[in-house]
Amino acid sequence: MTENVSAAQPAKAPAAKFGGKGLTIAIAVAAIVTVAGLALWVFQLTGGMVNTNMRNLDSWGLYITMFMFLVGLSAGGLIISSAPRVFGVEGFGGISKIAVWTSICCTVLAIGFVVVDLGQPLRLWELFAYSNLGSPLMWDIIVLGTYLILSIVYLWAMLRFEGGKGSATGLRVVSAIALVCAVLVHSVTAWIFGLQQGREMWHTALLGPWFVSSALVCGVALVLVVVIALRRAGYLQLDQKHVVKMLKLLGVFVLVDLYFFGCDLLTEAFPAGSGADIVAMLTTGALAPFFWIEVLGCAATAMIAFTPKLRTNPLIVLAAVLAIVGIFCKRVQLLVGGFQIPNLDMPAVVSGPGLADAGAALQSAGGAMVYFPSPLEFGVMAGVVGLGALLLLLGLKFLPLKPTEQSH
C-alpha cells in the first residue's frame, strides 16, 4: 500500500540491510561502464574531435551541457547541506554528509566533462601557464577547483566534529565559506555564457541568479532521490517529515525558476524583434520538445509538492526526477539554442567538413537542430557518469556517511 506523507509520520523500518552482494554488483557494473567510457575517450583522442558531431557552428555540445548540469547538481546539494548550519535552523535529519558526498561526486564529474571536451588534454597545464585572468573561463577553473577542495574540507570537518575533535563554531565557519562558494561557482558558470555579447540568447543579466535557482532545484531533487533510495535500501532511517520538508523546498525553488524563465521569455518576445525568433524556436521550433518537457515537468513537480494528498513516496520520487530532467532540458535549450541563432554576417562558413554557402548553412542551422551528439559522445558521457556512480557507491560503502546523533 502506498504511503501517504501529507503530514509528518515516523519513517518505516528499512526494507533490507544495505550492502552485501547487491552493492558489490552495482560497484562492478559502474566500474565496467567507466572503463568502457575511458576506452571510447581514448578512441576520441586518437581520431580527433571530428569523431564527435561538434563543428564550427556548434563548438560546444553534450560534454559542456553535462558540465553545466552537474555543476548545478553539486552546488544545490552543498547549499542544502550547509545553509541550516550557517543560519542555525533545523536541518533535514542528518543527511548533510550524504548531500556533501553527492556534491563532491558531481563536481568531479563536472571537471571530468571539461577534460573530455578538450581535444588535447595533455595541454591542460597551458591553462595555468598562460592563463588569462580576465576570462570567465579562467574564473570558473579557479572557483570550481576551490569549490571541490572546500567540499572535501567541509566533509572532513563534519566527520571531525562528530568524532569530538572539532568545534561547532569552526564547523559553522567552514559551512559559511562553503555556502558562499557554492553560490559563486554557479554564478561564474553562468557568466561564461552571459558575458558573451555575440550570443543574444545568452547575453542577459538574469543568467546568474537563474543558474543559482536551477542549481537549487536539481540539487534538492537529487538529494531527495538519493536519500529515499538509501532509506529504502536500509542505509539510513529518515523521518518522513524531513522528506516532506525537502519536497516543499523543491516546490518553492521550482516556482522561482519558472518565474525567471517567464521573465526571460517575456523580455525577449515583447519587443517583437530578434528575441521573438528565440521564443519561437523554443516554443514551436527545433527545441520545443525540451521546452515543454521542462515547463510541464516542473509544473507537475510544484503540483505534487503543494498538494498534500499527492505526497506519496513514489510521487515524491517522480517529482524529483521530473525536476532533474526539466533542468537538464533547460541546459540543452541554453547551449544548443545559443548556437542556433546566427551571430555573424559572413560571406561563407565552414559547416561540417566542407565549405558551404552562408545562406544555406545558416538557414539549415536555424531551421533544424544544428547539433545532435554522436554515438561516441553518448558513450563517453556514459563512462563519465559511470565514474560518478562508482565514487558515490564507494563512498557509501567505505565512508562514515550515515547520520549520527550529532548530525542535524
Each predicted region: which residue ranges?
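Membrane helical hairpin/interfacial module
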Residues: 58-122, 139, 143
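Alpha-helical transmembrane segments
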Residues: 39, 81, 154-155, 303-304, ...
